[in-house]
């Protein structure tokens, strides 16, 4: 019974390309089949302006709600309350995104956060950078990376196979959906702020993409960008 319900939910989540009416040139090219790989868009630096592009090119994307909070701001008519949702999306195979959405209701806030996370999607570099392992398979990160958001700072370190994700629940969710299986983390600042913690972890993963490597180093580290075949 539970399996049937899960299958029905999966069918509802399936993206209907035929019903989609793209609003941008890239969206039209994706619908026509001219662009069939999301790596082409990312490598060319083309802007992702429609979340439906990600739905069409990455159908195996998963979503996880990290936090939903009631936030308030002062107005001349009094306090105004809204819900703020933090969401992480990823396919557990080299792609991840983090987003935040606000609305007067929980549902629209989560949907906005999911759309924002899809538009912030990045490729993640994976490999084996731990001196204790050296297996060359893409189970960890290739080298140390740092990220920050607000007062929160996160440092990611490569770990040998079998260690798992030694991190807080928020960082563990982001790293897990990125496809990283083993990593150590160091955190500084007020990590109770879920969005800042998630964004700092996401920033650290993004900073992996700005390190230049020689072909020999890539081979030694087992460095892979994006989807691992």
Swiss-Prot record:
**The S5 DRBM domain covers which part of the protein?**
61-124
The record's GO molecular-function terms, alphabetically, read: rRNA binding; structural constituent of ribosome
GO biological process terms on file: translation
The record's listing under Pfam families reads:
Ribosomal_S5, Ribosomal_S5_C
Q: What cellular-component terms does GO give this entry?
A: cytosolic small ribosomal subunit
Family per UniProt?
Belongs to the universal ribosomal protein uS5 family.
Subunit field text:
Part of the 30S ribosomal subunit. Contacts protein S4.
As for what it does, the entry says: With S4 and S12 plays an important role in translational accuracy.
Q: What is said about the domains?
A: The N-terminal domain interacts with the head of the 30S subunit; the C-terminal domain interacts with the body and contacts protein S4. The interaction surface between S4 and S5 is involved in control of translational fidelity.
Query: What is the recorded name of this protein?
Result: Small ribosomal subunit protein uS5
| Species name | Methanococcus maripaludis (strain C6 / ATCC BAA-1332)
Q: Which gene encodes it?
A: rps5
């Amino acid at each position: 019974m539970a399996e049937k319900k899960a299958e029905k939910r999966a069918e509802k989540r399936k993206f209907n390309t035929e019903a989609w009416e793209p609003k941008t040139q890239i969206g039209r090219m994706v619908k026509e089949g001219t662009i069939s790989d999301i790596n082409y868009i990312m490598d060319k630096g083309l802007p992702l302006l429609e979340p439906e592009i990600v739905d069409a090119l990455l159908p195996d994307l998963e979503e996880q709600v990290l936090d939903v909070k009631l936030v308030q701001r002062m107005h001349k008519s009094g306090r105004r309350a809204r819900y703020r949702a933090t969401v992480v999306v990823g396919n557990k195979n080299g792609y991840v995104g983090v987003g935040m959405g606000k609305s007067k209701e929980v549902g629209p806030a989560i949907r906005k956060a999911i759309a924002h996370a899809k538009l912030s999607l990045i490729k993640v570099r994976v490999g084996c950078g731990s001196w204790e392992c050296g297996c060359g398979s893409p189970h960890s990160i290739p080298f140390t990376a740092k990220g920050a958001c607000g007062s929160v700072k996160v440092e990611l370190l490569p770990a040998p196979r079998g260690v798992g994700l030694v991190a807080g629940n928020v960082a563990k969710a982001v790293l897990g959906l990125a496809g990283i299986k083993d990593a150590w983390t160091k955190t500084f600042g007020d990590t109770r702020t879920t969005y800042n913690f998630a964004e700092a972890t996401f920033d650290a993963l993004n900073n992996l993409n700005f390190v230049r490597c020689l072909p020999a180093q890539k081979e030694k580290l087992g460095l892979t960008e994006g989807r691992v075949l």
